[in-house]
């Protein structure tokens, strides 16, 4: 993003243009090159929160020891924790409930963090054990942040104190929280019979009467279907007989028509014969 007040485009009066010579320029000439540049003010682009953050970051100045001016007994990096002179060794494994015997090592001190102290699953021994598990749940993140010297955070008071043992008791499944969404509700256990049907004893009189009525209805429907089939077959036979009669009638009428046509063809010849016989007489 460019601005007109950042740099001066026009040369000032009396300013000579830069000339590049073959030799190396001295320190005085290099210093004169940047005299006409203006500084940029970034205070308008920095918010109040960011300004406070920058002031906190740049307020710490390096000590003279950090620049190499340290004494014989002063550490090179004063902001870091001194190394532990004890040897780095893991303590022997202990499987007790309280993990009291950690053994000699770098993590055996009371104020140090043990990375091997993972959550130990213990089954509750009664209703009191499940309630103690909900009260004594421990967050390892709280323990790490509390022992970090370079981090400053405001932790909620609801978290457990770092002095509590690293144990997480698993609550029974019966005390699990219900699902939040109504669509994720657990299906209700299905009963032996669906809703709307009552249990009927097969040896009862009502069940026998119902089965008898169903059997009678099935037999009636089957008899009705058989009667319809027989009626259809009978109609088919009647139609076939009527078709045969009609065919015979058509053949008879065709023969009569042919006979009549032959008679009409012979009538003019007979008339001519009669006329010829009458003229001869």
UniProtKB/Swiss-Prot annotation:
Domain of life: Eukaryota
Positions of region (Disordered): 1-30
Signal peptide positions (record): none
Record-stated family: Belongs to the bZIP family. C/EBP subfamily.
Underlying gene: CEBPE
GO BP terms, alphabetized: cellular response to lipopolysaccharide; defense response; DNA-templated transcription; granulocyte differentiation; integrated stress response signaling; macrophage differentiation; myeloid cell differentiation; phagocytosis
Subunit structure: Binds DNA as a homodimer and as a heterodimer. Can form stable heterodimers with CEBPA, CEBPB and CEBPD. Interacts with GATA1 and SPI1. Interacts with SMARCD2.
UniProt-listed CDD domains: bZIP_CEBPE
Pfam entry (one): bZIP_2
PTM section of the record: Phosphorylated.
Keyword set includes DNA-binding: yes
Molecular-function GO terms, alphabetical: DNA-binding transcription activator activity, RNA polymerase II-specific; DNA-binding transcription factor activity, RNA polymerase II-specific; identical protein binding; protein-containing complex binding; RNA polymerase II cis-regulatory region sequence-specific DNA binding; sequence-specific double-stranded DNA binding
UniProt tissue specificity: Strongest expression occurs in promyelocyte and late-myeloblast-like cell lines.
Region of interest (Leucine-zipper), residue spans: 230-237
PROSITE patterns, sorted: BZIP
Name recorded for this polypeptide: CCAAT/enhancer-binding protein epsilon
Entry-linked SUPFAM superfamilies: Leucine zipper domain
Disease the record associates with this protein: Specific granule deficiency 1: An immunologic disorder characterized by recurrent pyogenic infections, defective neutrophil chemotaxis and bactericidal activity, and lack of neutrophil secondary granule proteins. Neutrophils of affected individuals lack lactoferrin and show abnormal nuclear segmentation, bilobed nuclei, low alkaline phosphatase, and increased number of neutrophil mitochondria and ribosomes. SGD1 inheritance can be autosomal dominant or recessive.
S-S bonds: none
Record location of the Glycyl lysine isopeptide (Lys-Gly) (interchain with G-Cter in SUMO2) cross-link: 121
Segments of this protein annotated with the region Basic motif: 208-228
Location of this chain's protein in the cell: Nucleus
Domain bZIP: 204-267
Summary of the function given for this chain in its UniProt record: Transcriptional activator. C/EBP are DNA-binding proteins that recognize two different motifs: the CCAAT homology common to many promoters and the enhanced core homology common to many enhancers. Required for the promyelocyte-myelocyte transition in myeloid differentiation.
Entry's Gene Ontology cellular component terms: chromatin; nucleoplasm; nucleus; plasma membrane; RNA polymerase II transcription regulator complex
PTM-bearing positions, type Phosphoserine: 181
Record organism: Homo sapiens (Human)
């Amino acid at each position: 993003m460019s601005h007109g007040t950042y740099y001066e485009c026009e040369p000032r009066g009396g300013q000579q243009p830069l000339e590049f010579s073959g030799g190396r320029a001295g320190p005085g000439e290099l210093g004169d090159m940047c005299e006409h540049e203006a500084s940029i003010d970034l205070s308008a682009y920095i918010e109040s929160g960011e300004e406070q953050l920058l002031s906190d970051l740049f307020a710490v100045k390096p000590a003279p020891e950090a620049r190499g001016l340290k004494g014989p007994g002063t550490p090179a990096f004063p902001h870091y924790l001194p190394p532990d002179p004890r040897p780095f060794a893991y303590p022997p494994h202990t499987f007790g409930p309280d993990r009291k015997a950690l053994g000699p090592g770098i993590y055996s001190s009371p104020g140090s963090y043990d990375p091997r102290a993972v959550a130990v699953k213990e089954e509750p021994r009664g209703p009191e054990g499940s309630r103690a598990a909900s009260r004594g749940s421990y967050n390892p993140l709280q323990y790490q942040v509390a022992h970090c010297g370079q981090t400053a955070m405001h932790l909620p008071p609801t978290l457990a104190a770092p002095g509590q043992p690293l144990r997480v008791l698993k609550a029974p499944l019966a005390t699990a929280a219900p699902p939040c969404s109504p669509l994720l509700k657990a299906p209700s256990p299905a009963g032996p019979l669906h809703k709307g049907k009552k249990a009927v004893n097969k040896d009862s009189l009502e069940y026998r009467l119902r089965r008898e009525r169903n059997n009678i209805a099935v037999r009636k429907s089957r008899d009705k279907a058989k009667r319809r089939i027989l009626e259809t077959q009978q109609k088919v036979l009647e139609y076939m007989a009527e078709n045969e009669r009609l065919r015979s009638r058509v053949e008879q009428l065709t023969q009569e028509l042919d006979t009549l046509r032959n008679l009409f063809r012979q009538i003019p010849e007979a008339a001519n014969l009669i006329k010829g016989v009458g003229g001869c007489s």
